[in-house]
Amino acid sequence: MSFLVSKPERIRRWVSEKFIVEGLRDLELFGEQPPGDTRRKTNDASSESIASFSKQEVMSSFLPEGGCYELLTVIGKGFEDLMTVNLARYKPTGEYVTVRRINLEACSNEMVTFLQGELHVSKLFNHPNIVPYRATFIADNELWVVTSFMAYGSAKDLICTHFMDGMNELAIAYILQGVLKALDYIHHMGYVHRSVKASHILISVDGKVYLSGLRSNLSMISHGQRQRVVHDFPKYSVKVLPWLSPEVLQQNLQGYDAKSDIYSVGITACELANGHVPFKDMPATQMLLEKLNGTVPCLLDTSTIPAEELTMSPSRSVANSGLSDSLTTSTPRPSNGDSPSHPYHRTFSPHFHHFVEQCLQRNPDARPSASTLLNHSFFKQIKRRASEALPELLRPVTPITNFEGSQSQDHSGIFGLVTNLEELEVDDWEF
């Protein structure tokens, strides 16, 4: 009799046994504050949101059976080409979803363990601004993860295809508010996200903001006690290096904590406002030195770019640097409007500049917490819910598909979406 268990069977047992038996218990365990924990509690608004948002309100779960899903077209690859992302239709309701299929036979044991951690976190977390997994199951030798299709794609998709010089400030405020609410919850649960960036911010057809990238989350709780710092370097993190804080990149004995995510929020704010991530295309060693030496990215506008540079063509400006003290040569980039003026001839509010400066403090202790940032003056301009305001602010962008929740069995036009879907960097979504 063989005691060897295949990787698909091992993860199948883990999914069925651990999630069913320990799911609710884990929600209670990690939701409690560890003894002696003196960290700041979440603000009242966030706490109310967490308390009132029941598991049933996240989204109805789908049946964990491959036959319930009609795979329509491949819209992306990822996880070192072991993952295929499909647009699919959930047959019982006709709703269009995203199905992420991972070939477990080709995964190393380390990858399987990595995936187990992601699935555990997906069951543990329950928040309106965190992407919910509608179903997770094994089909043949593949792990299937089902999520709702995000019709606006990611924030990175938006800046790559429509807002090449950056988004408007109010839209960014709505997006970052959703991200900070998710981070406030994640930190309250004792985790560090470690992968906040525009491609991990998804926007649904109705303008709701979701934070994804759960695969990189790390628990700061060990043996029931919250650790002051952690030292683990994120696996498979090559694509996220520009967003990582100096203390994470430094990998020394001082370690890092949840404040490292706040630095990533600051970098993401610059990414959304400038149309590209700071430290873009910079070698990893140089990037580390820049961050350790205190080089701080900024919002590119009339207050940070010298007036003489604003009269130059974009090809001779700081357009692609994201750093206020460097002059780079780059190819011209299209602007949002028809005006021939410099794309960064604009002015962001002092509140937005201060918000970014606070997030990018070199000393982690000087950075505000997520709950504190939610009360920052930058967000005072928000007057409506994101679901009401964001679709208007994203115009002329329209959702890629309006099939979400449809009961129709008619697929006419669905394959006409393929061209648009291929423009999305779905392999970066990481749900």
UniProtKB/Swiss-Prot annotation:
Question: Where in this chain does the entry annotate a coiled-coil region?
Answer: none
Give the matching InterPro entries.
Kinase-like_dom_sf, Prot_kinase_dom, STRAD_A/B-like
Q: Which superkingdom does the taxonomy of this entry point to? A: Eukaryota
> Can you supply one Gene Ontology CC term for this chain's record?
cytoplasm
Question: What does UniProt say about this protein's domains?
Answer: The protein kinase domain is predicted to be catalytically inactive.
Q: Which family does it belong to?
A: Belongs to the protein kinase superfamily. STE Ser/Thr protein kinase family. STE20 subfamily.
- Please report the name of this protein according to its UniProt entry: STE20-related kinase adapter protein alpha
Q: What are the leading ranks of the lineage?
A: Eukaryota, Metazoa, Chordata, Craniata, Vertebrata
